[in-house]
Amino acid sequence: RHAFPAPRQPSAHAGLFDLLHMGAAASHARTKTLETAMGPILFRSFCPPSFVERLRPDSGLHSFARLPEREHHLLLDIAKSPDCALTLAYTPAGEIVGQVTIAPADEWWEDIEDLYEVAVEVSVNWRRATIARTLLSFALELDALEDMIFFAIGLSWHWNAKDLGISLHHYRALIAHLFGTQGFVEYPLTDPDVSKERTNVPLARIGKRIDKHVANQFLSRLLSPDSFGRF
């Protein structure tokens, strides 16, 4: 499975920022600072390519692309897409230690409106610095939050539980709790092949203003036997 979206044709919309902020006259980028036991961490939303280029990846940022350098290229591609929103956590020295990507769902979901996939990662070197929850919460501070459906597919083969000295089941519980703090709900596995690995987990947050028909359409697709087979 591609952890990050493949390059797409430019959206007919002005950009994902305008959709997520309902046309509000706000700055495209917000910033925040978190003091941790390992030092201060800076957060920035809607990171432009020029900003990503000036940063470098921490050595522990490699869950999705295997190598930090490759992941940096992926993050740069995401920043270049008007359809995606990239939020980064980084040190004052310019090392990327975490990221949250919000991207339109792929073609398999194309008839479902206002649907976005969320991917989050924190460097293994910074996992005990309480960054993930703050980063995800910061990325989801959106005016249109209740008008959107967000989902995340937790696949255990992306997880580096051994680096943390914990089991996959413990890691799964951490993932579910992390997203649960932002209103995501865990759903059951239905694909017979993927469900053999009980640590995989689908999570979703359905906005309060989403039409019931759209919500039911999404859940029917998410829980279909073909859903996880795509990944």
Which sequence ranges carry the predicted segments?
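Well-ordered, non-membrane alpha-helical segments in soluble/globular domains
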Residues: 68-71, 134-138, 168-177
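A conserved beta-strand-loop-helix scaffold within acyl/acetyltransferase catalytic domains
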Residues: 66-115, 120
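Conserved GNAT-fold acetyl-CoA-binding loop/helix
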Residues: 52-74
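Conserved acetyl-CoA-binding loop-helix of GNAT-fold acetyltransferases
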Residues: 122, 128-144
